[in-house]
Amino acid sequence: PGERKLQTPCRISVSAHSVDVNAFVCRRPDENFEGTYRWMLERNLKMFAVAFGLDAMGDIYLSGRLPLTAATADGIDKILGSVLEYADTSFNVLLELGFASAIRKEWAWRVARGEPTHNLTAFIEPLGLSDPEATDTVN
């Protein structure tokens, strides 16, 4: 498991010529599609072995392919390591870009009811959630 994205469902398919890896990162963004997709495309230029993509519903995946001849223990380890690294390091950024309004609403709802906000603390600064009343309730 990662530190930000605790689970990353991953499908590995073996065909006659390749090993394909597809890992679910997050559902279709609620907003800021252009900003979210632009960030993903720019990030693709810097990534090793996998790239961001979308399914027919707009959900975000990491996908990679190895030729069957490269599907050694080391090759599989590298591609799965890339999936873990990029899913984990990209998760909060994708949430900030594509779900900011929902996160703000959830924060306000929890603060108003005295509910724990500890799993939203990563978004305090980037989304401007640092209201003094709200930060007093961070658990």
Model-derived features: positions:
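Short, highly charged C-terminal tails/helix-capping segments
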Residues: L95-V138
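Short, intrinsically disordered, mixed-charge
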Residues: R38-K46, G81-N92
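Short loop/turn segments at connectors of secondary-structure elements within structured domains
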Residues: L6, K46-F48, E96
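Short amphipathic alpha-helical segments
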Residues: P29-T36, G75, I79-S82, Y86
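Short, internal acidic amphipathic alpha-helical interface segments
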Residues: N22-S63
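Well-ordered alpha/beta subsegment
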Residues: L54-G81, T89-F99
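Short low-complexity stretches enriched in small and charged residues
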Residues: S15-N22, Y37-W39, H118-F123
